[in-house]
C-alpha cells in the first residue's frame, strides 16, 4: 500500500546525529539504514564541508543528499529523483565574503575577530576537535569562514548589525562562529522542500538539531526535534510541539526520530 506521505528528515550532524566529541555514530548506523530502506529521506543539513559530509556518507555506506556549510550548497537531490539537480550553490564564495568584511567592518571590531584558518595547527585541533586529514577536510571551506570572536555581547551585536547591512550573516555553532552569506539552514531546507514537492504530493518534515543555529530549522518544520546538549538551555526555547531527548547524540538522535515517527503514525 502506498504511504500517505513522504517523510523527510533534515538533520544537523555534530552533537545531533554524531557524538559531540568523538563524532561517532556506530550505535545508530543500522537504524539510519533501516529508515532509508523504509523510504524515509534523510538529508544532513550541517555546517560541515562537502568533504566532511561525503566521508560521513562513506562511513554510513549510503549516498545521502545533503546541505553543507550552513545552507551554502545543496548536493545530490538527483539521488532522490534523477531529474532533480545534482548541485545547487546558494552562496557567494568565501573570498568575496571576506572582501566585504575587510572593507565594511570597523577596525576595532576586526581586532576581536580571529579566523580559524590563520591559527596554528595545534589551536585548530583544540578548537575543532579534529586532527590530520579530518582537520584538513573541516578547513576545506568554499563559502564560509569559521572564526572566534573575543569581544563582548555589545560588540558582537555591532558586528552582526554591520554584517547584516551588507547581506552577510553570523551562524553560531557548538564550537565556532561562521561568517556566511545571506543564507542559512532553514532557507536551504525550504528550497529542498519546494523541489521535492514537484514529485511528492504530501511531505512531512522532521528537523533535528542541538544548538542555536538549528532553531530556525526546527521552527520551520512539521516535527521539531532537539537532541540533549548540556551546554544548551532547553527552557529558553519556545517551539511548539518540540520533541527532545534525555540522551545526547548519537542515541538521542534515534530517540527523537522514533518519537517523531510515532507522532506521524508512520
What are the residue ranges of the model-derived segments?
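Anion (oxyanion) recognition and catalysis
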Residues: 36-37, 164, 219
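Conserved acidic, metal-coordinating active-site core of Asp-based
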Residues: 108-206
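Mg2+-dependent phosphoryl-transfer enzymes with acidic/Ser/Thr/Gly-rich catalytic loops
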Residues: 2-4, 25, 176-266
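Short, acidic loop-to-helix structural element flanking the phosphoryl-transfer center
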Residues: 19-39, 94-95, 157, 182-195
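Active-site phosphate-binding/coordination module
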Residues: 24-117, 230
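Short, structured coil segments at secondary-structure junctions
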Residues: 60-62, 70, 166, 220-222, ...
Amino acid at each position: 500500500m502506498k504511504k500517505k506521505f513522504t517523510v523527510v528528515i533534515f538533520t544537523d550532524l555534530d552533537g545531533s546525529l554524531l557524538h559531540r566529541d568523538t563524532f561517532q555514530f556506530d550505535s545508530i548506523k543500522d537504524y539510519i539504514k533501516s529508515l532509508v530502506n523504509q523510504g524515509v529521506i534523510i538529508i544532513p543539513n550541517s555546517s560541515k564541508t562537502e568533504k566532511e559530509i561525503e566521508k560521513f556518507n562513506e562511513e554510513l555506506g549510503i549516498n545521502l543528499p545533503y546541505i553543507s556549510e550552513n545552507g551554502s550548497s545543496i548536493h545530490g537531490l538527483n539521488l532522490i529523483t534523477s531529474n532533480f539537480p545534482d548541485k545547487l550553490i546558494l552562496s557567494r564564495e568565501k573570498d568575496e565574503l571576506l572582501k566585504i568584511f575587510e572593507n565594511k567592518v570597523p577596525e576595532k571590531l576586526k581586532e576581536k575577530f580571529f579566523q580559524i584558518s590563520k591559527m596554528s595547527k595545534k589551536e585548530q585541533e583544540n578548537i575543532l576537535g579534529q586532527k590530520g586529514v579530518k582537520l584538513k577536510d573541516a578547513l576545506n571551506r568554499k563559502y564560509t569562514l569559521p572564526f572566534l570572536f573575543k569581544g563582548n555581547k555589545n560588540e558582537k551585536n555591532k558586528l552582526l548589525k554591520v554584517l547584516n547591512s551588507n547581506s552577510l550573516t553570523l551562524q553560531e555553532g557548538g564550537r565556532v562562529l561562521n561568517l556566511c552569506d545571506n543564507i542559512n539552514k532553514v532557507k536551504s531546507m525550504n528550497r529542498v522542500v519546494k523541489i521535492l514537492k514537484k514529485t511528492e504530493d504530501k511531505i512531512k518534515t522532521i528537523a533535528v538539531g542541538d544548538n542555536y543555529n538549528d532553531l530556525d530549522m526546527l521552527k520551520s518544520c512539521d516535527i521539531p526535534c532537539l537532541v540533549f546538549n548540556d551546554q544548551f538551555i532547553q527552557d529558553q526555547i519556545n517551539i511548539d510541539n518540540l520533541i527532545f531527548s534525555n540522551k545526547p547524540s548519537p542515541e538521542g538522535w534515534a530517540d527523537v526520530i522514533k518519537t517523531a515517527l510515532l507522532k506521524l503514525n508512520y
